[in-house]
Amino acid sequence: MRYISTRGQAPSLSFEDVLLTGLASDGGLYVPETLPQFSHQEIASWSRLNYADLAHKILLPFVEEDISSSELKTMVDETYASFNHKAVAPLIQLGHNEWVLELFHGPTLAFKDFALQLLGRLMDNALIKRDKHLVIMGATSGDTGSAAIEGCKHSNRVQMFILHPHERVSEVQRRQMTTLLGDNIHNIAVRGNF
């Protein structure tokens, strides 16, 4: 599958190229050139899958030109095994026709863990294949920083610099961002806000 810029002026790229590039050269966002089609029967057959198996089925068409099914399965399984509920995202019934999807069972208790924990593994996989290293600089005033840090803290291919506004994040968020151990993680408090 190829990915194209929303502004239409950048070359199309593969999944791994997009993963390691970020924004398109024309300032746009990369989106799939086409969307995979799943039959009703196929979707119905997924209804009893666990979270990791479902994620694998949905993600595979988007990445299969760069990542084998078995590689993706390993990354997805390892990612969601670190969540603290066996269902990963349990659907809890509160009452008649009242349900809540719990999205706080990841390592940082933020819904962003669902994407950012897997993203770290996908990036590491691409960097290892290409024998490359990457520097990521991010700025956050919330839980994105801790989820991104947690997703990349074990990588020996990524150096991550996370900026957060000094005394403008909650104490829990500050501690999550500044106490995670990783030689590749650099957290910087910046006076002011952004």
Feature-to-residue mapping (PLM):
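PLP-dependent amino-acid enzyme catalytic core
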Residues: 1-194
